[in-house]
C-alpha cells in the first residue's frame, strides 16, 4: 500500500480511504504545545488494509522455496503477460528437472571421446594371441567419426588437436589395414596443414604433445607412412621432446606415482613390472591411452577390464581421461553457484559435496578419486567448496604445492597454469585465522594474476573459454568478501560459454556436465525473472520514497537506488521479497537520518516521538517538518513492514522491530557506536522479516556472530569514510585492499559462519550475518564509480 500525505504541517490521514489508499484530512492547529489528540487514530497507527502480496509458484520443497515466476497480481495483469509467465514457468521447470537428473546420475564423468586415446586403444592386439584387434569397436568408432576434410578431433578447430588426432587414427587404421580411403584423406589433411603448427599459440599445445606427436611419427614411418618433419615448427617440437625426455627422472617414474604416468604411451625403456604396482583400478592415472600402451606390453587383466568398462560406456571410443568424477562433481557445483541457480539443486549439491569429501585427502585431490597424484587446480576447487559447505578440510593440502613462497600446479613442476593460480587465489580467500599458507598463496597468486593481466597474457593451458580474462578480472577486482551474489552471477553469465567452452588435455575435450548450455539457459531465464521482480519492487520503493517525503531530506534518488541494489544483490530470490524490502527501506531510513544536521534537542524529540508513537507540536501550533517527517516516516515504515511480515509469515514482529529501531535511535542520540548499531539493526530486521523465531536471538552462537559482525561492519564504515575524506591518510594493505583489522575480523566471521559446532544455528541464519558484513565490505572496497556501473548492470541490463 502506498501512503500519500501532504507537506503541510496540519494534515493527518483519516480512516476513510479511496481505492485502498488513505485519504487526507485537515486538522486545525491548536494554540499550545501538546501531543495531538483529536479523537482520531494517527495515520502511523492505522491498521493496514489486507492487500494481496505478489504470489509465486514454486517447484521445490527446500527451506526457502524457489520461485519460478509471478502469478497474477492486483495491479499488473494482461492475458498476454499471464501466458508468458506460464510459459516461462514451464520452461524453467523443464530445465530444472533436466539438470536435476544430470546431478542425480553423476558417476565417473560425462565427457567427449578422444580420437587420439581411442586410436591407442584400437592398436592393442588380442591378448589371447589371435592376431586380431582386441577392441574392434574402437576401430569402428574411428571409421565412423572422420570429418569431411579428412581429420579427426574436436569441433573447435586447433591444428595441434586435429593433426595429433588425425595421425593417431590413421596409424590405427593402417596398422589393421582398414579403410585405405580414410587413411588417404587423413594423410592429405596432415600434409596440407602440418606447417601450421608453428603458428599455433603454444599455450594451447595439448598435454605431452611434444612427446606424443614425434612418437606417432616414428610409428607411422614403420608402417610406411611418410610425414614431413623437417619444417622449423617440427624441429622446434623435436627439440622440446629431447629436452623433456632428458628431464624425466626414470628412476622416480618407476618408484612412485607422478603425473608422468598419464603419458606413458610411446615411451621407451620402461620397466612394466615395476610400473604395474603404480596403477589404480587398472588404469595409469585414469589415462586410457597410457593404459592401452601398458596393456600392449603386459597383457594385464586389470588394465583390460578398465578399458572394457570405458569402451562400453563411450560406445567404442574412450575419452582423454576416465574417470573424472572429482572434476565433474566439483566444477558442476561451482558453475551452478556462480550462475546463480544453485538454490534449485540444494539436495543434489549436498550429495556432490559429500561425494567429494569422501575422497578428500590431507594432500588434496586430483581429477579422479583415489589417485595418489594431486594437482593444485582440483585441490583448490575442492578445498574452497568443501569449506564453504562446512566440511572440515585441512590447509595441509596446499603444503606440497608450495616451495620457497612460490606455488606450483603439480608437485615437482615449475610451470604455472592461469586456471590453477586462479583457483588457488579463490581458495585462499576463504581463510580462517591462522591459515598462514593460504595468506601466502593469496599474495603469490594475486601477484601472478595481476602481472598476467597487465601483460594481456591471460591464456590458459587447460581450457579455452569464452572470457577467461573477464573471469580473472572479476576475481581480482571484486574479492570474495565483496562479491555480492547477483553481481557475481551477472558477470559470470557473460563469461560462461556453456557448450562452447573446451578443455585441453592430451586432446581437446568437453565436460558435458560442467560446460553446459542447459545451465546457461536456466541461468539466463532465472536472472531475467528475478530482475523483473526487482524492477517491480524498485517502482514501489520509489513510490514509497515520494509518498513518505524521504526526498524532502535531500536523499538523492540515486542513493535510494543504491541502497535497494545492495539488498537486491544479496537477498535476490523473488520469494524473499519481504526480507529484501525490509533491508532496503531500513538502509534508506538509516542513511536519511544520518544525513540530517540535527542538534541534540531535535534528536531527542525524534527519539521521543518514535518511542511513544506520537508527534509533538511547537509553541506556535506548528510541527517541525524535519522532526515530524522523520518520526512519521519511521513509524509508518515499521508498521508497514510489520504488517507485510504478519501477512507472509503469520507472526507479529511489530514490537521487536520497534524495539530494534528504538535501540538504534538511542545510540544515535547519545553519539554511540553507530557502525556497530547499524549492522545490528540490519541483522535484526533481516531475521525478523525472514520469520526467524525471536528465541534464537539469545542463542550464544547468535550473540557471538552478532558481536563479530557488528564490530567488522563498524571498522568497514570507518574505513569507507577515511577513503572518502582522507584517502592519503588511509593505510591500505596492498594485497587485501583494506586493513589488517578488517581482514582479521572477516576471517573470524567466515570461520564462525562456515564451521559446524554442537548446538549450532542453521546455515541460512549464519550466512545472513556474512551477507550483511559482505554488503558493508562491498561498499567500502569498491569505488563509487564501479558501484554505479554495477547498479545499472545488475538491475537494468537484461541478460540476452
From Swiss-Prot:
Keywords: Chloroplast, Isomerase, Magnesium, Metal-binding, Plastid, Transit peptide. Its EC number is 5.5.1.29. Its main location: plastid. Mg(2+) binds at residues 375, 377. GO terms for molecular function: kolavenyl diphosphate synthase activity; magnesium ion binding; terpene synthase activity. Belongs to the terpene synthase family. This is Kolavenyl diphosphate synthase TPS5, chloroplastic. It comes from Vitex agnus-castus (Chaste tree).
Amino acid at each position: 500500500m502506498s501512503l500519500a500525505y501532504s507537506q503541510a504541517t496540519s494534515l493527518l490521514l483519516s480512516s476513510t480511504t479511496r481505492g485502498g489508499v488513505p485519504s487526507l484530512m485537515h486538522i486545525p492547529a491548536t494554540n499550545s504545545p501538546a501531543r495531538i489528540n483529536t479523537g482520531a487514530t494517527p495515520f502511523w497507527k492505522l491498521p493496514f488494509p489486507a492487500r494481496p502480496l505478489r504470489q509465486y509458484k514454486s517447484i521445490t520443497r527446500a527451506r526457502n522455496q524457489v520461485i519460478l515466476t509471478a502469478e497474477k497480481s492486483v495491479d499488473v495483469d494482461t492475458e498476454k503477460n499471464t501466458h508468458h509467465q506460464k510459459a516461462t514457468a514451464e520452461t524453467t521447470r523443464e530445465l530444472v528437472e533436466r539438470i536435476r537428473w544430470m546431478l542425480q546420475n553423476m558417476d565417473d564423468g560425462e565427457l567427449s571421446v578422444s580420437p587420439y586415446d581411442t586410436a591407442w586403444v584400437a592398436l592393442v592386439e588380442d591378448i589371447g594371441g589371435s592376431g586380431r584387434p582386441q577392441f574392434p569397436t574402437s576401430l569402428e568408432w574411428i571409421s565412423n567419426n572422420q570429418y569431411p576434410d579428412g581429420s579427426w578431433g574436436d569441433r573447435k578447430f586447433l591444428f595441434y588437436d586435429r593433426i595429433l588426432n588425425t595421425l593417431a587414427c590413421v596409424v590405427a587404421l593402417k596398422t589393421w589395414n582398414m579403410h585405405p580411403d580414410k587413411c588417404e584423406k587423413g594423410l592429405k589433411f596432415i600434409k596440407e596443414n602440418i606447417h601450421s603448427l608453428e603458428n599455433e599459440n603454444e599455450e594451447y599445445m595439448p598435454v605431452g604433445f611434444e612427446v606424443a606427436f614425434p612418437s606417432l611419427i616414428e610409428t607411422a614411418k614403420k608402417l610406411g607412412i611418410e610425414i614431413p618433419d623437417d619444417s622449423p615448427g617440427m624441429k622446434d617440437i623435436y627439440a622440446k621432446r629431447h629436452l623433456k625426455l632428458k628431464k624425466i627422472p626414470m628412476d622416480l617414474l618407476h618408484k612412485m606415482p607422478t603425473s608422468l604416468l598419464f603419458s606413458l604411451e610411446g615411451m621407451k625403456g620402461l620397466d612394466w613390472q615395476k610400473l604395474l604396482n603404480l596403477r589404480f583400478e587398472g588404469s595409469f592415472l585414469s589415462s586410457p591411452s597410457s593404459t592401452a600402451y601398458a596393456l600392449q606390453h603386459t597383457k594385464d587383466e586389470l588394465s583390460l577390464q578398465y578399458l572394457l568398462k570405458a569402451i562400453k560406456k563411450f560406445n567404442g571410443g574412450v575419452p582423454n581421461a576416465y574417470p573424472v568424477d572429482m572434476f565433474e562433481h566439483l566444477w558442476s557445483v561451482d558453475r551452478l553457484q556462480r550462475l546463480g541457480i544453485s538454490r534449485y539443486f540444494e539436495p543434489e549439491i549436498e550429495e556432490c559435496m559429500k561425494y567429494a569429501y569422501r575422497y578428500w585427502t590431507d594432500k588434496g585431490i586430483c581429477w579422479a578419486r583415489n589417485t595418489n597424484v594431486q594437482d593444485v587446480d582440483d585441490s583448490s576447487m575442492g578445498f574452497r567448496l568443501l569449506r564453504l559447505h562446512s566440511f572440515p578440510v585441512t590447509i595441509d593440502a596446499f603444503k606440497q604445492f608450495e616451495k620457497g613462497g612460490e606455488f606450483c600446479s603439480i608437485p615437482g613442476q615449475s610451470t604455472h597454469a592461469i586456471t590453477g593460480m586462479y583457483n588457488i587465489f579463490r581458495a585462499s580467500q576463504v581463510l580462517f585465522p591462522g591459515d598462514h599458507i593460504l595468506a601466502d598463496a593469496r599474495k603469490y597468486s594475486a601477484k601472478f594474476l595481476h602481472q598476467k593481466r597487465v601483460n594481456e597474457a591471460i591464456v590458459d593451458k587447460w581450457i579455452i573459454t569464452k572470457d577467461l580474462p573477464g573471469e580473472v578480472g572479476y576475481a581480482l577486482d571484486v574479492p570474495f568478501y565483496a562479491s555480492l551474489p547477483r553481481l557475481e552471477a551477472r558477470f559470470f553469465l557473460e563469461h560462461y560459454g556453456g557448450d562452447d567452452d573446451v578443455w585441453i588435455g592430451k586432446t581437446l575435450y568437453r565436460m558435458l556436465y560442467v560446460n553446459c548450455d542447459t545451465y546457461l539457459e536456466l541461468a539466463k531465464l532465472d536472472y531475467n525473472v528475478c530482475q523483473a521482480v526487482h524492477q517491480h519492487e524498485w517502482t514501489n520503493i520509489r513510490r514509497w520514497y515520494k509518498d513518505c517525503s524521504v526526498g524532502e531530506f535531500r536523499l538523492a534518488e540515486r542513493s535510494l537506488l543504491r541502497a535497494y541494489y545492495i539488498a537486491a544483490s544479496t537477498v535476490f530470490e523473488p520469494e524473499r521479497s519481504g526480507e529484501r524490502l525490509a533491508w532496503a527501506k531500513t538502509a534508506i531510513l538509516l542513511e536519511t537520518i544520518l544525513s540530517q544536521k540535527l542538534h541534540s534537542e531535535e534528536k531527542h524529540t525524534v527519539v521521543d516521538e518514535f518511542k511513544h508513537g506520537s508527534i509533538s507540536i511547537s509553541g506556535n501550533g506548528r510541527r517541525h517538518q524535519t522532526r515530524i517527517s522523520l518520526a512519521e516516516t519511521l513509524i509508518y515504515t515499521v508498521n508497514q513492514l510489520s504488517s507485510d511480515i504478519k501477512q507472509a509469515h503469520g507472526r507479529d514482529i511489530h514490537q521487536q522491530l520497534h524495539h530494534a529501531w528504538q535501540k538504534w535511535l538511542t545510540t544515535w542520540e547519545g553519539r554511540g557506536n553507530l557502525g556497530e548499531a547499524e549492522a545490528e539493526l540490519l541483522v535484526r530486521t533481516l531475521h525478523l522479516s525472514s520469520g526467524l523465531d525471536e528465541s534464537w536471538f539469545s542463542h550464544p552462537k547468535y550473540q557471538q556472530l552478532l558481536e563479530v559482525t557488528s564490530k567488522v561492519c563498524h571498522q568497514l564504515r570507518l574505513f569507507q569514510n577515511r577513503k572518502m575524506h582522507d584517502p592519503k591518510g588511509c593505510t591500505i594493505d596492498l594485497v587485501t585492499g583494506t586493513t589488517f583489522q578488517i581482514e582479521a575480523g572477516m576471517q573470524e566471521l567466515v570461520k564462525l559462519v562456515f564451521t559446524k559446532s554442537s548446538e549450532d544455528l542453521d546455515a541460512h541464519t549464519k550466512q545472513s550475518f556474512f551477507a550483511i558484513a559482505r554488503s558493508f565490505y562491498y561498499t567500502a572496497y569498491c569505488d563509487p564509480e564501479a558501484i554505479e556501473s554495477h547498479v545499472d548492470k545488475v538491475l537494468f541490463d537484461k541478460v540476452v
